[in-house]
């Protein structure tokens, strides 16, 4: 059953690929060394879903499980923390390698740097990561959240000591609001995981921070005897994580990259629409962007991420809510000896896309386009755990958002 799923093979004109070098292994290792200096750091699991792979007729399915990241239940802190570190390092005229966690969090550093106010917009995970990092480093955070934000996600950020509001506008308008406030605030800075003309340095640092999870996964695969995945499926909101993941693999395996697909929420499928347009330019999606995949409810793409994606992605997909909910249930009810994975609505959609391509009779053309077969080694990203526990239980226990159901209906 592929009801509501739309996809396209990437035929967008290629650019000069000037941003790919951002995601070189060398640059990503620099970010990873920074993260390793945090006492809360540990490598998150790469879950081996061997029974599911056998059921679906592929060699392997591996899931990078970010529900364990820094105790925050999501990957986003990797980007915000690294961008903060890079910003402070730049302001002080120092290299980030000179500013590990114990230096950044010291009284001496605060005397030297002072205190900045980091503004951001978020559906929950990015803002929580920014607030967490600001709190640990003795800085201030102001977070704007879009309408429809759940109380749990709001409360999680308040607990980190940030100033937080829920606004009556969508995510993209919250970004504009936070940027305008930062510009008017002394020692204010916008830390956003999307880029636009004139604002690219901090988003590029955020993407490099996200690279930590890809570097870990790549190293974990090698420890399991896998040289590289044949397929990588990753979700996208603005495309920062997707650009980081695709960029890392495209740069490292230039001569033999994996087949890579990007999965978006159908209510906010700006990258898919941009791919369909085939102009090379981003197409925005406006309106309320209603989807259970709150972390993917972004209608305006990251210009840096898009530049990488249009050059290296094979398939762009626009995915309905039920596909995400189904994958959340699959993770929660594993086959055989497969591990149980807690994957929230924004975390699970790549597995839902993979399952549909391999399992559904009317998805044979998609399976063929993705070149999936019995030798395929698939890597999917689960970017969050149950960041909204009530919604998670409704999906897993009550079967919410079954076939043909979506938040917008």
Can you name each region flagged by the protein language model?
Residues 1-409:
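PLP-dependent amino-acid enzyme catalytic core
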């Amino acid at each position: 059953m592929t009801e509501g799923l739309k996809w396209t093979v990437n035929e967008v004109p290629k650019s000069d690929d000037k941003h790919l070098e951002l995601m070189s292994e060398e640059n990503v290792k620099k970010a990873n060394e920074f993260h390793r200096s945090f006492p809360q750091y540990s490598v998150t699991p790469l879950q081996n879903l061997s029974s599911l792979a056998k059921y679906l007729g592929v060699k392997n399915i591996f899931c990078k499980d970010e529900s364990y990241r820094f105790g925050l239940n999501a990957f986003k802190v990797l980007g915000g923390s690294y961008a903060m570190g890079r910003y402070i390092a730049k302001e002080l005229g120092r290299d980030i390698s000179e500013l590990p966690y114990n230096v950044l969090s010291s009284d001496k550093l605060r005397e030297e740097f002072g205190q900045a106010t980091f503004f951001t917009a978020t559906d929950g995970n990015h803002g929580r990561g920014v607030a967490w990092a600001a709190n640990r480093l003795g800085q201030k955070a102001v977070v704007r959240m879009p309408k429809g934000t759940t109380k749990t996600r709001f409360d999680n950020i308040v607990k980190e000591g940030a100033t937080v509001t829920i606004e009556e506008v969508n995510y993209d308008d919250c970004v504009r609001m936070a940027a305008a406030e930062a510009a008017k605030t002394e020692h204010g800075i916008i830390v956003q995981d999307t880029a636009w003309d004139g604002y690219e340095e901090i988003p590029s640092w955020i993407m490099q921070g996200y690279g930590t999870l890809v570097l870990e996964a790549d190293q974990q695969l090698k420890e399991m005897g896998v040289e590289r995945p044949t397929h990588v499926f990753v979700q996208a909101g603005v495309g920062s994580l997707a650009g980081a993941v695709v960029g890392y693999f495209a740069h490292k395996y230039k001569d033999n990259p994996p087949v890579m697909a990007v999965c978006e929420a159908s209510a906010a499928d700006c990258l898919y629409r941009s791919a369909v347009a085939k102009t090379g330019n981003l197409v925005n999606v406006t309106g309320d962007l209603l989807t259970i995949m709150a972390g993917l409810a972004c209608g305006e793409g990251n210009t840096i991420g898009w530049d990488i994606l249009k050059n290296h992605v094979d398939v762009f997909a626009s995915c309905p809510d039920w596909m995400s909910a189904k994958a959340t249930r699959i993770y929660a009810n594993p086959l055989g000896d497969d591990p149980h994975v807690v994957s929230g609505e924004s975390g699970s959609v790549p597995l839902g896309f993979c399952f549909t391509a391999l399992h559904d009779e009317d998805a044979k053309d998609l399976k063929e386009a993705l070149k999936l077969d019995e030798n395929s080694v698939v890597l999917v990203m689960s970017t969050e755990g149950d960041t909204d526990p009530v919604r998670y239980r409704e999906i897993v226990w009550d079967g919410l958002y079954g076939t043909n159901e979506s938040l917008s209906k």
